[in-house]
Amino acid sequence: MKNSADITVLGAGSYGSALAISLASNGHKTLLWGHDPVHMQTLAQDKCNQAFLPGIAFPDCLQIEADLAKALAASNNVLVVVPSHVFGTVLEQAKPLLRSDARIVWATKGLEPETGRLLQDVARDVLGEQYPLAVLSGPTFAKELAMGLPTAISVAGTCPTFTNDLVELLHSPKRLRVYANDDFTGLQLGGAVKNVIAIGAGMSDGIGFGANARTALITRGLVELTRLGEALGANAATFMGMAGLGDLVLTCTDNQSRNRRFGLALGKGCDVMTAQAEIGQVVEGYRNTKEVFTLAKRLGVEMPITEQIYQVLYQGKSPVDAAKELLSREKKSETPAQ
């Protein structure tokens, strides 16, 4: 079946819109679909996403499509950019409408709610084995990507041809550098765990602990991510790249991060509900914390920072008490014997 578009993007929030803008700015005909018809009509009229990316005009190659069937019929390349807690639901909606030659990539960062499963497992459960799968991950703030500021990300998948095609589609010499990676598991995990650690970094700064504490938390957070990744068969080297260290540093240190701002509010004394309301958009790290904690417990992986953040978010522990518990842990070597 011939494509009438180069790629279809499912999810018209800030990140989905930014990726669609970047793709269309490369000269690729891009369809952008969202679940809210009123929102999609507004996007079509304004020719920009005024709600999430105000003032950034859509390129001529970007087309708004409110009909999911039409959006999925237009291209065999489907990029899913929705919150992790609705990822499976969106795939269920898409499944009967997908072309037989469809190829699915997602930029969703997170794990399955309640179970902590990787999104690749969710996708396989819903879609079966017939479609090539891939994931896009790395340090990207939507606004900067949409503005065309230099950005670098990684992509990995189940099919090398699809991965290479995505590199060609997404890469732009002027705005976006894309690295191919063969660690499908590692790229998915990095995008979830960094959200958790960013909440912790925000809490630390909100309390007023300073740059030393923030840096220590980021460094030990990277250790936790690597530990969990290795337990799942990921390559430790992945976590020194874009989807690990890169995304972790970005999300933990810049207030464009909703997860960091959420943590800041908690550190300054807000309760969880008030802090979420203050952000006004989905704070992926709130759910990710429970998901990562669940996964670590199931695998028997020690993740003390994640555990303390979980206790703050879900068990009412104060951020100060969580910090005290981390600092009072038993002394240990930074490089334990293997």
UniProtKB/Swiss-Prot annotation:
Q: So where does sn-glycerol 3-phosphate get bound?
A: 109, 138, 140, 194, 247, 257-259
Q: Name one GO cellular component term.
A: cytosol
Looking at the Swiss-Prot or TrEMBL record, what is one Pfam family this protein matches? Answer: NAD_Gly3P_dh_N
| UniProt enzyme class | oxidoreductase
Which Gene3D superfamilies does UniProt cross-reference here? N-(1-d-carboxylethyl)-l-norvaline Dehydrogenase, domain 2, NAD(P)-binding Rossmann-like Domain
Name the major location: cytoplasm
Enzyme Commission numbers on file:
1.1.1.94
Give the UniProt keywords, A-Z. Cytoplasm, Lipid biosynthesis, Lipid metabolism, NAD, NADP, Nucleotide-binding, Oxidoreductase, Phospholipid biosynthesis, Phospholipid metabolism
Q: Name one GO molecular function term.
A: NAD binding
Could you mention a single GO BP entry for this protein? glycerol-3-phosphate catabolic process
Binding-site list for NADPH: 14-15, 35, 109, 142, 258, 282, 284
Coiled-coil ranges per the record?
A: none
Could you tell me which SUPFAM superfamilies the record lists for this protein? 6-phosphogluconate dehydrogenase C-terminal domain-like (SSF48179), NAD(P)-binding Rossmann-fold domains (SSF51735)
Which residues catalyse the reaction?
A: 194 (proton acceptor)
Report the pathway entry: Membrane lipid metabolism; glycerophospholipid metabolism
Q: Which reaction does it catalyse?
A: sn-glycerol 3-phosphate + NAD(+) = dihydroxyacetone phosphate + NADH + H(+); sn-glycerol 3-phosphate + NADP(+) = dihydroxyacetone phosphate + NADPH + H(+)
User: InterPro entries under this entry?
Assistant: 6-PGluconate_DH-like_C_sf, 6PGD_dom2, G3P_DH_NAD-dep, G3P_DH_NAD-dep_C, G3P_DH_NAD-dep_N, NAD(P)-bd_dom_sf
Give the protein's biological function.
Catalyzes the reduction of the glycolytic intermediate dihydroxyacetone phosphate (DHAP) to sn-glycerol 3-phosphate (G3P), the key precursor for phospholipid synthesis.
The protein's matches in HAMAP family, at most eight in alphabetical order, are given as:
NAD_Glyc3P_dehydrog
Family assignment from sequence similarity: Belongs to the NAD-dependent glycerol-3-phosphate dehydrogenase family.
**PANTHER family per the UniProt record, alphabetical:** GLYCEROL-3-PHOSPHATE DEHYDROGENASE, GLYCEROL-3-PHOSPHATE DEHYDROGENASE [NAD(+)] 2, CHLOROPLASTIC
| Name of the protein this chain belongs to | Glycerol-3-phosphate dehydrogenase [NAD(P)+]
- Please tell me the species this chain comes from: Shewanella baltica (strain OS195)
List the lineage, top down.
Bacteria, Pseudomonadati, Pseudomonadota, Gammaproteobacteria, Alteromonadales
Gene label: gpsA
